[in-house]
Every structure is written in C-alpha cells, then in structure tokens.
C-alpha cells in the first residue's frame, strides 16, 4: 500500500527524450517518479517564446496590430494579401525550408485566415506593400547566407545518415538470418502472451466442509442486514478516517463491528509498544519451519493485543523474479516452494491468535516502477504479462499453499495482469482464486488498487480499501453509495453483494472474532492505538475537519515479557537467518578471549556507516532512508522500531578480555585507518523499498545490485590494508536482496563474509551470537547471488522506462526464475540458491526413494461441493431506505453507504458488462478443495536418508530435496526441505515426502495438473548445486 503524496499527479511523459531523464549509476538514464523534480525537457526545437526573442519580424508583428480572421476558401473572393508577397520572390522553396517553425505556422494559418489591420481593415496600400517586399527580400538574403554557412553540417548529416542506413540494413539482414535459424530450431516450450480471459460469475463461498459452521453463522447474520449495512461492511470509510490504516463501516443493527486492518508483514505499522521483527527475507533465510511459525505467532499475538482484526501480511508477491525489485525483502525468497512454506507457516502462526492473516499481493507485483499511475505520471499501471503455466507453477503456488493454511484474506495487487487490473481480473479472482483454489475468505484491494466500481465487484473483489476511489482522501468512493446505487439499479446483482459480505462475516466467525470484546460504546474492544498520532488524545477522523477527538492511544504493551518476550524469537530468527558465505581458515567464529597474533592486545577496527546507530531507527517516515545500520527496507511493510541494537553497540561488550577497538562509522576511510589492526570488521548494505518513497536515488526498485554508499570501495580499501596486508577482514552485509561482490570477494584480505539480511530490532545481538559462535551459522540463501545483474537473464530486469503508454512487462521466461535460469543456461553463480556454510560439517548418506502410490497421469474428476453455499432473498428493498437518515450529520470526506438522492436507482437493462460476462464457465477440473483438487496433495513418494554431524561442534543442517522432471522442464526444482540440529557425531534419519502436485506440471491445453511420463530424478543435498544424493521414481 502507499500513503497519499501531495506531489502525485501529472500526465504521461512519453515525449521525454532519453537524455532528459534522471541519471542513475553506471551512466544509465532512468525515469524519475513524480516525487522528485522533473527536469525541463531539452528539445531540438525552441519554444514560441524563444522565437519571439530571436527570429520574430517586427513588421510582421506590427506591435500586435494584426489579428487573424477566418476565410471561407470556397465562398470568398478575397485572397490573403500576404501570400502573393512571398510567391513573387525567387528561391521560394529554399526560403520555405529555412524559415522558422513559427513562421511556417503563420504561413499555414494565412491560408485559412486573412491578416487584418486593427486600425484599418482595408487592403494594404502600395507603399506598405513595397516596404514589406523590401524587408522580406533583405531577410531572404540573410537566410541564404546563413544556409551557406550550414552546408558542411548538411553534408555531414547526409554522410552519417548514409552510414546509419547501411548499419541498419546489416542489422536487419543478420536479424533475419538469426530469426530463420531460430524458427527452424526445435523449441519444445513456447510461452504465448495472451490477454486475460474472463471468468463469471464470481463463485460463492461456503462450499468447503471446514468452513461450514462459519458460513452458517454468517448467513444468519447477513439475512438480517439492510442493504446499506451490507455495503458498509464491504467498503472502507476512507484514508485516515479511522484509527487504523484500513477501517470498514459497521453494521449497527446486527451488531457487526467496524473491522481494523493494519500493516504488515514485519509487524504492526504505525503502532506503539510493538516489535520490529526480522524481515521476511531474513525469515526465509532460516529455512526453519518452526521459527517461521513462531514468528507468525508473535506477530499475531501483538495484533490481537492491539485490537487489530486483519493483519496485512504475510507477503508472497513479489516472488523475486527481478532481483532488484524494491519489495522483494518483504517476502521469503525467490522460489515458489520456499515462499509457500514460509507464508503458510506464518499464516498458521498469525491466525492461531484469532487474527485474520492476508496473503498478498495477488499476483505478479514484481516491480515498483509503474505499479501505480499517479506515482509516475502515466495513464495507467503497468501490465505484467505471464503465461498460464508459469502463473500456476511459480507465482500462484504460494497462494495455493496459503489457502491450504486457511488464510482469511487475499489482497489483490496494484498492477495489471495480462492487461486487466488485478483487482478486477475475473480470471485471477473468480477463475483461479475462488474456483480452482477454493478460496473461502474475502478478497480485499491494495490501497487504491481498485480502478473501477461495477467491474471490480463482478470481477471478484469483496472489500474496497481504504474506501477512497481513484484519489487519496477525497471522500469519493468507487463503492460506498455508488455500490448501493448499482445494486438498486441491478447493474451489480444483489447475489454478488450478498456473497461479498458473507465472505467477510464468515472469516470473522471462522477466526472466532465474534467472541472478542466489542468496541466502544458497547465495550472496550477495537483498536487501542492510533496510526496518526502518538498522543494519548487525538482526532477520531484525522482526514476530516469535523473536530471530534477522544483517547486514541492506550499504550498497551504487546511485546511480551520474560520467557514470552517477542525479542527472543526476533533474535533467534535474525541469528538463524544470517548466512555465512565465506570463511577462510575458520576465521569465524571469533573467540571472546582473543589476542593479537603477536601476543598483545587484539586491535579491532570497525568500519562503515552500517555499523552504527546514526540518527536512530525511526529517523525517516516508513524507514525511507539509508542511514546507520540497515535493519529493514522501507515502505508500508515496515514498523516503528521500539529500539534497535546496532552492531557497534553489541560489539562493545562482546569480548571477555581487554581489546583495543576503534570505530570508523563512515564509508570513506583512509588506508592508514586499517594498517595497524589485527581484525577489521566492515559493515556495508543495500536498501530498497516501496515505490511511493525515493531515497538515495533509488525509486523503490534498486538501480543495480552493487553495495550502496560506496560499500564496495570501503571493503577493498580496508581488506587491502588491514594489518598491513596481514590482518583479517570480516565483511557483514545487511541487504534487501542479492548483491554483486565480484570486485572484492576473492581478495586475499577478505577472510569471512556474513550476509545478515534485514535483522530487525535485535540486529547487533543476533550478529554477535553468530560472530562468536553462540549460534551456528545455519542460514541458507533464499535466492541466487550472481556475478552480475545480467546473469539473471533479460526476463529478470526491472522496466525502468515506460515502453508504451501502458507499460508492458512480458514474463516470457518466468518458469525459469532465479536458480532455474542459471541452471538452464549453465551460468556459474557466485553463490547458488540454498547455499550457506556452517561452523561444523555434515554428511548425507543412505538415500532411499519409496513410492507411496502408483503413478497416474491426472487427478480424478473434480469432487462435488461438500456444502451448498448460503442462499438469500434477492428481492431489492425500497430505494428510499438507502437515503441518509433524517437529521444525519455526515463527517466531511467520510465514506458512507447512504444515498443523497434517488437518481439512477431505477432497475434497468445494464449493457456495459465486461466481455464474457454472459458466458457460462465450466468449473476447473483442478479445483474442488482448499488450494486445489484434494488429490494434488496426496503423498506419492517417500524420501529417506541419514544425516550425520561429522564436525566437532553442534550445528544445524538444511536438507533440500529437488526434482528433475523428464525433458522440457527446468533442470531441477526445489520441492521440500527440513532443518535439523545435531550434536557432534550424532546421526539421524530424515524423512520427507513428495505430493502429486510436486511431481506434476500445469497443462495449458487440459487446464489441469498432469504428471508426465518417464522417470523423475530426486536429488538431495545442501543447495541447488550441492546435491550428492540422487534416486529415481
């Protein structure tokens, strides 16, 4: 989501030249968002004002005494007095070529208008005509002289144009040859980009057995609701019109409360006395299912204590197709299975507290550039174009697992998918999410991602957030009273509204929120904090001027205490999410009793802005700046830090013996600053975030994958000079995603590298735990670290410049995300997906592959609905019942469901339905259960092996299972994993299973999951390229 920005606005700037755009690193030119000043256009043509200053003719202007009069060229016998004057001269064509653009416009205008003297409307007299002829002849001579001076330039242009034509011809010939060669080469897989299909009507919820009781309760409540109450529940009341970032209206008659929706995936945004947990990318790096769930439990507990009904997380989109994507850090990694497992465990943890979780952003929200039109001054958001197979096997996979985890809400994303806005894309919401995946909860929009009223309702959207329509805080909603009117005039069927509100109420019952204390005035429930002020007393409707206020902050401490303190789980996740990438001669772990190699006091240098606290963790709104140690990215997915333990603070008390420590908390250091040190600790980072904030020249998405703020230079300088070349340098990276480190990773002075990701509030403590070996280095990469951004392939590049009025991003190779692309093209990465060193060693052995079921090509026929969905009376109420009640005083900009008049409420034959609205849709054969057909999740294969700790200390190993399909598939794909802890010499059996879906692909022809014929190779190992064990099935 994004907050309103007063600088948003403008129009599509497709007329900007390449050299007009803001610059980025490596000399590239980039498109700038509207938050920053837009440079003036540099044009090869001058403006009219410039013509007036340099090329205007005072006789032609006559001090503005001439005006233009329309001429009927068919009925008038008067010709322009100006035209014969020109045509009587010699060299007319040369003259016309040389005159300025303004004069050409005047000549063109003269063909349609007569020049008339305001002082005398009669024709020119002979003296005036002669004078004008003389002056024009003189001007023509000067023009010819000027033209002769430009002859060399003219010939030079001709030469260059000829050369360009030859080059273009050669390129076309070569391209044609290559195209012919490619077209005659065997290409087993083709990914056609087709517009999004339609899928109507929106499937009704309440068809799965484990939701039956919740839907029965919801049906009883909804039956007693009025039309305006139903609309009130589906529409937010407006940005800053309640205490939370999102607030629905209540249904007072049936005692259904207003719901509080609050960010986000890292904890509670805009709240006091809450925890700043490690980011999703750090959590994914743990590869620890138990920690993933425990973190979710703690997040859900804090949301419950603060009175939040719906927590807007976890994030599983973006998936990380683009390694420079600005919000990748909110998710768990660049693989659908890793992302799915972490998301599902987080959801189970959050919802164990009765708080509704939100799976977001559905789907293909892979970059920040052009995700919203008003952020970039373009007509509409970009379109992410993806094939059906990649959509199912990659991007929708985590959402399917989230639905299996019983997630209550799904948030649709900002951008378009196959040129249909995600929040009204009926194929996505109706066809895939609700029908095929059996989603029983409600679909909410991202904040202002709703782009239509009727189409979004029919397309499957159930809740509009924050209620505002196309603009922030204007009090004009696409739903609210407009939805009331649309239902009354039958353009939106009342059955659709009934399903929308029933889904929301059923989710409320499903999480047991009907047992929560009611909010004021009936009780003391509801949110006990304000998103808009830290003061105890504040406005109830901050976005309005109504002046109503109350106690809004009760300062409830939700962080837990003692052994239940959430700082404990935050520290564990941050430590286990730290990845050891390099460790020469067992430089790590450090000894707390260390001394200098010469036997004296250990001399330690600490380098880099990232080591220190700088201005504090909350110095910039939504963490929108890179200063001090980096513990989170920026945007709506972050939180207010209760505290932040920086590395420099934690290191002050890390050694048991006396040491000599010197801190250089800056990125510009001199070689002399390192020459007398035994140990050099270098802290560097790379930041990014949501697109509504620009910081350090980064407009959401990173410009490249290099370290920021001179980090690469800092590492090279320190490592080359530490101890006069004899010292040991340890590099600690805090980053939102992969960083290219080719300029220093192989330097002999770099002895160890730790990737600490985004560790949250316990940053320094968790780092010290790993540095000194209190915790094993057990993190594993949740993405591939390539040697360059180009290694990830053309399909993984952020679109930084709009390539059309509606920017188009074609995910042609989306099936080959991250390590799959590296494997497909045999590219050697710097560090592969799943890689990570440990302080001990492990051995994997005795692999056993056992079939649990016989292979079969496809799933059985789709099972019938287990339960019939609710049925309601569909008669419409008296439109007058939807009017504002007599004497009602509306709050300015607050969004109500009431009508101010009855215009447009009469039923009529609405004829502007989306394409395909009247076509009957066949239920997906891949549906029938939560997450899809129940048979997809049957266990097909058992994988057993022995894991032995062959080192001299306790440690944790991540055992990863990959599957190689028969030909025409990615080389291998992750399908399962587990993490175990072993004492030295301990040996233990590990067992995992593979489901039918794990061994199937999505058939675009059959629109179903199909298990291919042939043998599967099942690989087991420590990373995507360290797979010592292999069996077949």
Curated annotation (Swiss-Prot):
Residues 183-1033 are extracellular. Its EC number is 3.2.1.21. Residues 1-71 are annotated as: Disordered. Residues 1-161 are cytoplasmic. Residues 11-20, 59-71 have a biased composition (Basic and acidic residues). Pathway: Glycan metabolism; cellulose degradation. The active site is at residue 446. It catalyses: Hydrolysis of terminal, non-reducing beta-D-glucosyl residues with release of beta-D-glucose. Coiled coil: none annotated. Pfam families: Fn3-like, Glyco_hydro_3, Glyco_hydro_3_C. The chain crosses the membrane at residues 162-182. It is an enzyme of class 3 (hydrolase). Keywords: Carbohydrate metabolism, Cell membrane, Cellulose degradation, Glycoprotein, Glycosidase, Hydrolase, Membrane, Polysaccharide degradation, Signal-anchor, Transmembrane, Transmembrane helix. Beta-glucosidases are one of a number of cellulolytic enzymes involved in the degradation of cellulosic biomass. Catalyzes the last step releasing glucose from the inhibitory cellobiose. Belongs to the glycosyl hydrolase 3 family. This is Probable beta-glucosidase E. It comes from Aspergillus fumigatus (strain ATCC MYA-4609 / CBS 101355 / FGSC A1100 / Af293). The lineage of its organism: Eukaryota, Fungi, Dikarya, Ascomycota, Pezizomycotina.
